[in-house]
Each structure stands twice: as structure tokens, then as C-alpha cells.
């Protein structure tokens, strides 16, 4: 019986400020661009480790809260819903960028 050695687990935390750099407006295209370097490094690390990625969302949820407060035409959403929205948004950006990097490196 050929038993494959299990890879060690590596936990990586990306702060919300890793996606929005100082002086940037925080557009989605800027955030995707800012993810390329750290996600490229994570993709390469995945050859040797099982990866768990966690992330913050402070700047993103703050921006969404400001958007909510700027419009009286629609009901504002509570903060916990905005947190969930931005977590999903950032999770999608990470997953999409990671998938592209893994395909480029030929990693399943």
C-alpha cells in the first residue's frame, strides 16, 4: 500500500488593507490587481502545503456603509448584512484570482 504523506497546513491571513493600498480609491479592479502578488505566492506555496486563507474586510465594509448612508431612496441594510456582503465579495475575488494563478502554474 502506497501511503502519500499529508502536506502540512498553512494558515494565511490577508488584511482588508492588502486589497486596497494607501492612496487608492478601492475600486474592484484595483483590488483584483492588488491580489495578484499575494495570491501568486499562495498558489506557489500550495505545491507544498494545504492552504487556508482568511481575510479582513474593514475598508470594504466601511465603504459599503458610506454608500448606504448616502442614499435615502432605498432602505439601509444593517452592518451585519454589509459585513456578510463584503466577505462574499472578497472571497470571490480571492477564489477567482487563485483559480487563475493555479491554472497558469498547472496546479490542480
Predicted feature descriptions by range:
Residues 70-108:
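Ligand-binding beta-strand-loop-alpha-helix segment within the catalytic cores
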Amino acid at each position: 500500500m502506497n501511503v502519500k504523506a499529508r502536506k502540512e497546513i498553512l494558515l494565511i491571513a490577508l488584511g482588508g488593507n492588502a486589497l486596497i493600498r494607501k492612496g487608492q480609491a478601492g475600486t474592484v479592479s484595483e483590488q483584483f490587481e492588488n491580489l495578484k502578488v499575494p495570491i501568486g505566492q499562495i498558489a506557489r506555496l500550495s505545491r507544498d502545503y494545504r492552504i487556508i486563507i482568511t481575510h479582513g474586510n474593514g475598508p470594504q465594509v466601511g465603504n459599503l456603509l458610506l454608500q448606504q448612508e448616502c442614499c435615502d431612496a432605498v432602505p439601509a441594510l444593517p452592518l451585519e448584512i454589509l459585513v456578510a456582503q463584503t466577505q462574499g465579495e472578497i472571497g470571490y475575488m480571492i477564489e477567482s484570482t487563485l483559480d487563475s494563478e493555479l491554472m497558469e502554474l498547472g496546479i490542480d
